[in-house]
Amino acid sequence: MKFEDNEMTPSMENTINTAVIIEKPKKTTKSINSEIFLDPNKTKVAVLDIETSSLKSDFGIIICAVLHTLGTDEKYKVCAIDLANKDLLSEEKALLEVLNTELENYDGVVTYFGSRFDIPFIRTRSLYHGLQPPSKKRSLDLYFTVKRTTNPTSRRLERINDILRISDPDASPDKTRLGMKEWNGVVFNRDSKMLDYIVEHCIADVKILENAVWRFKDFLPERIMRC
């Protein structure tokens, strides 16, 4: 499975005034300025979304994952389970091996409620399969920026996208819906059409999220922390 890229001692007779430059080790910080975080020339950031068979990671599996490098024209990286394999757990493990490796190529990640769902889900499922979870990264969870700066009736990504599309309908796609039919169709019926629908939904969510990041740029935290 893969994604679809000296010391000097002066003489007593002739003392020389010498300035010794000591190179200090670079200081590593747990946070980064948000402007640097958003600049693709300085920081490589993944916009991430996953789709799962359950909201809880002890009973559910990851069906697909989509990554896009923030602020670039790179292709969307998609990884999904293969329904032709009877062992979906082995498929999920293979997916995670690819996803975790790919995430290590990034300096940071953008999600929507991902600090509470996507990232913990990936970590839990990785531990389940005996895999090393992705390392801590600078993480922007846009949900909490939306929560802090707006007051719509719902803070779901779908509603935020609806609001943003009123003034600029071409900036992001309309958000599709997922329900019992799609999830059950994949997990219990191994319906490839349903899986394709879920993958397209996941890609659209990443596009919507990336657009929202730029629209909320002025309201982001001044520093992006690791989590």
Short names for language-model regions:
Residues 1-44:
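N-terminal accessory regions of nucleic-acid-interacting proteins
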Residues 110, 159-227:
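Acidic, Mg2+-coordinating catalytic module of metal-dependent nucleases/exonucleases
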Residues 51, 58-71:
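Acidic, metal-ligating active-site segments
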Residues 49-51, 118, 141, 205:
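Acidic active-site catalytic centers that drive phospho-/nucleotidyl reactions
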Residues 43-54, 202:
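Two-metal-ion RNase H-like nuclease active-site motif
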Residues 39-40, 56-60:
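A short catalytic or substrate-binding loop motif that flags glycine-/basic-rich loops and adjacent residues
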Residues 59, 122-124, 214:
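Short amphipathic alpha-helical segments
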